[in-house]
């Protein structure tokens, strides 16, 4: 199977996670951010992730891909209950996290930005909706304090380092991509249980953290 992705994209990370958790091989293909032609040819519009199944048919939508791959062998992993507290935490933090993440994505060495045109496409599109990246970076300190406070609240909710609620569930698929991308932000205080969970999930899913390129 082949998975077409952007490295920074949280929806792509969700799809990548299930392959790592189940130890199923997948061929990753990173599309350029300004390449509309390839995904449109596959699924009719510019979006990622896109899974090319073994029968060569294409499947978009991250959670559809997660459920498809999880059930392929008849032994699904994501059988745990979801937590309303985790859902509420994600809703709160996702409300502002992009103000920290988007301007940092734009400065980072992701393969989807490997041409100047691809990087410019991302900057132009995201600044139009999120605001000027230089302004957002200038306001980082307050947002970093907010995220550090919110991570302290999350620390109390983590049951085990290998599954946020004690048993693997969709909450892990929703939570880890955000934590992984937040490793791109320098200066965040990571509480110990959150850090252990983040690091353990990175190993389980075979997805790299971004700490070495933090801004």
From Swiss-Prot:
GO terms for molecular function: glutathione disulfide oxidoreductase activity. Residues 1-77 form the GST N-terminal domain. The keyword Cell cycle does not apply. Disulfide bonds join 9-12. The keyword Transport applies. InterPro entries: GLR_AS, Glutaredoxin2_C, Glutathione-S-Trfase_C_sf, Glutathione_S-Trfase_N, Grx2, Thioredoxin-like_sf. One of its GO terms (cellular component) is cytosol. Pfam families: Glutaredoxin2_C, GST_N_3. SUPFAM superfamilies: GST C-terminal domain-like (SSF47616), Thioredoxin-like (SSF52833). Keywords: Disulfide bond, Electron transport, Redox-active center, Transport. Involved in reducing some disulfide bonds in a coupled system with glutathione reductase. Does not act as hydrogen donor for ribonucleotide reductase. Belongs to the glutaredoxin family. This is Glutaredoxin 2. It comes from Escherichia coli (strain K12).
